Amino acid sequence: MYQSMNLSVSSNFTHRSLLESRFPIFSTGFRKSVNLKPPRVSSGPESNDSGHETLTDKLIHLLRAVPDWADEIKERGMQQKRSLYTHEKWVEHRSSLRHVRHLLSSFSSRVILSLIPPVFFFTSVAVVIASYNSAVALDWLPGIFPILRSSSLPYQLTAPALALLLVFRTEASYSRYEEGRKAWVGIIAGTNDLARQVICSVDSSGDELIIKDLLLRYIAAFPVALKCHVIYGSDIARDLRNLIEADDLSLILQAKHRPRCVIEFISQSIQLLKLDDAKRDLLESKMLHLHEGIGVCEQLMGIPIPLSYTRLTSRFLVFWHLTLPIILWDECHWIVVPATFISAASLFCIEEVGVLIEEPFPMLALDELCDLVHSNIQEAVKSEKVIRNRIIAKIKLHEFKHSSNGRHRS
């Protein structure tokens, strides 16, 4: 049966030997196209290889269990909502008991939990090296095995380089955090200023009132859309449900760039307002802060610290702690185990903080800032008529107290 099938295939194409002799590049593909043998079902070497791969996968899964658990806790902490500080929180922040509070919360800190894999690994390496050196010193091993020891002079010379590398790495991450914070300060200030200009410039009557209400909703929706754009796992449909209407929300959800779609809603609404050119140009100029905010946020999200710098810091730390027990053996002996533990916990903690704040937006209280913008706009709308009527009443009272010729009435 298989011979007949192979003959039928060969009859429609050039002979295999002739094709391979003239065009060797087609030989592999041709063999694959006419491979009509049924799959093997016997328990031969292939089944042993698959069983070996299964054991390897299980071993890899076992070794990755603790790092995956630590990463899951860290990512869960990144998605927690931050809150703005109040006076009570600042008092607690300055409290003399803060060190005790920070110490007691160590086991729930995602920074410390993320240090478990590297610190445990390097401490285990220190235990292995200390055990080996002790076995050699006690003649438990043949004399050909040397004691792993070295001079501490190379470490004394390279320690300042490692310290500077960690400092510069953390400082670069903090600069990104500070840049993201300033960008959002400008976004919130620009949003509030644009809303204030709309409230003051647009009449609250007729069609203008409808457009004004929609425009203020779009302005309040912009920081929410940008927040969902820069924070992974945000639910923009839930966050915007109470701000804008359902048909507008569906259009925003279909857009590839949702913050710019909200800006387009704002621009079109401004164009529909019956304003003179000066006021319209003023409102358009206020939107420059929103465009700049989008640019800065996308730059921070898409361009990390140069990867060569991050990798250099990581490799330096790894090689440093792999050889640290060898360097300290002559002076510390078994004390190299706690010394390696303390060194790894300290230095990797500094590096971990730099990695966490490199992405600044999960560290900021963006949800509360967006809620603050919404509440500020609502308060400004409610107080607009009250303040306007009060000022008009004061003007009328002032005119009533003065005569037509400018003399004050006694």
UniProtKB/Swiss-Prot annotation:
Belongs to the anion channel-forming bestrophin (TC 1.A.46) family. Voltage-dependent chloride channel subfamily. More active at positive than at negative voltages. Repressed by the general anion channel inhibitors dithiocyanatostilbene-2,20-disulphonic acid (DIDS) and niflumic acid. Mostly expressed in flowers and leaves and, to a lower extent, in stems and roots. This is Voltage-dependent chloride channel 1, chloroplastic. GO terms for molecular function: voltage-gated chloride channel activity. It catalyses: chloride(in) = chloride(out). It comes from Arabidopsis thaliana (Mouse-ear cress). Residues 1-110, 169-315, 358-410 are lumenal, thylakoid. Voltage-dependent chloride (Cl) channel critical for proton motive force (PMF) partitioning across the thylakoid membrane by anion influx into the lumen during illumination, thus being required for photoprotection under fluctuating light conditions. Influences thylakoid ultrastructure, including lumen size and organization.
